């Protein structure tokens, strides 16, 4: 029915706006960033609607003293930038590093920069699956630009699959020009 279609479209639009806000915040932007974009962008009608919804979303969170996941990461990073009494960080381990967002990496980098902690990051660019939630494979692929004295250890042996299956999947994965070159055994 027409009513069901309208409800379905509303739910889809709501999800789209929520995804936009999440991706925007995950990439270290805030309302002021969006205001600047709206001000400087010629076709600003949709962005203005999103900005208004963003304001309402933030107001609702503030009125209920709520935080979303991205807020927690951003606030933790700000606290670590202000307070220097966290010298007890010696090591940071990040698993599934290929699925790290900019704000999550900034949190780890703040600790590393202020404590000299050693980062161990484990990941596989061929297994990156969270781009839809703001994770950025660029961070994984360019970690050497952000971490001094980076040492890379490649694990090339797997015992999960036959060599035939490994070769078939590697042939498929290696067709992607953005993947790291790798050979598996």
Labelled PLM ranges:
Residues 127-185:
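Conserved coupling/interface region of RecA-like P-loop/ASCE motor cores
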Residues 22, 74, 109, 167-174:
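Generic alpha-helical structural context detector
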Residues 12, 16, 48, 67, ...:
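Charged, alpha-helix-enriched surfaces in structured cytosolic catalytic cores
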Residues 42-142, 157-161:
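Conserved helicase NTPase motor core
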Residues 25-33, 116, 172-184:
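Proline-centered turn/helix-capping motifs that create local helix->coil transitions or kinks
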Residues 1-8, 38-42, 61-65, 87, ...:
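Short, polar/flexible loop-turn hinges at active-site or ligand-entry regions and domain interfaces
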Residues 1-60:
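Coupling/switch/interface segments within P-loop NTPase motor domains and analogous charged loops
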Residues 21, 95, 165:
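Residue-level signature of catalytic and energy-coupling elements of molecular machines
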């Amino acid at each position: 029915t027409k009513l069901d279609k309208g409800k379905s479209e509303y739910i889809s639009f709501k999800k789209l706006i929520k995804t936009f806000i999440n991706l925007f915040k995950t990439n270290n932007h805030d309302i002021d960033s969006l205001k600047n974009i709206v001000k400087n962008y010629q076709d600003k009608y949709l962005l203005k609607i999103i900005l208004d919804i963003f304001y309402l979303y933030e107001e609702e969170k503030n009125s209920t003293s709520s935080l979303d996941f991205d807020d927690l990461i951003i606030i933790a990073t700000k606290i670590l930038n202000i307070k220097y009494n966290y010298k007890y960080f010696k090591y940071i381990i990040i698993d599934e590093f290929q699925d790290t967002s900019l704000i999550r990496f900034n949190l780890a980098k703040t600790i590393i920069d202020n404590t000299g902690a050693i980062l161990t990051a484990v990941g596989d660019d061929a297994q990156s699956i969270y781009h839809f939630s703001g994770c950025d494979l660029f961070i994984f692929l360019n970690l050497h630009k952000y971490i001094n004295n980076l040492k890379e250890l490649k694990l090339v042996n797997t015992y999960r699959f036959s060599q035939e299956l490994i070769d078939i999947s590697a042939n498929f994965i290696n067709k992607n020009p953005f993947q790291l070159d790798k050979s598996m055994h």
